[in-house]
């Protein structure tokens, strides 16, 4: 596999298991949310999610850096973004967390048109309840995954095997072998002679 295959197509094929792609997207969103917005907290806090948490994926949690309570919503769509589904989640968030939540990060694998009436209506609904909405969508999510290579490995099977990887691993192996490795020592075998026909050396 080529390096840098962090795409939504790769995400779907790499996460096609019994739980399904949507659950894996929720997991990815939770990890990005934690690394991006909670890692600077002085007190380590873990994201807690009740079964079928209403409106947002987990309970609101304090962002100590900005002194506000934040949450996140993960929306994975197969086709176009469904603004009605986003609105339903926003309504539940207002109902359950008004006065307890300052900002929702909306992770969505599709691009959202923030100037359309549907989105503006969702934003107004939340703003009227004192909750801001910050969309993190499509390629921005992929860029964040590239920032954390271990997430690329886990969710996109992007193991970073490249020419440089082979060169680095060979150098490490040579260093481990130390004086036991001698580049001048080379045994010519029947297999290497047969291969040299194809390699033209």
Feature map (PLM): residue ranges:
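Mixed-charge (Asp/Glu-Lys/Arg
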Residues: 1-188, 194-201
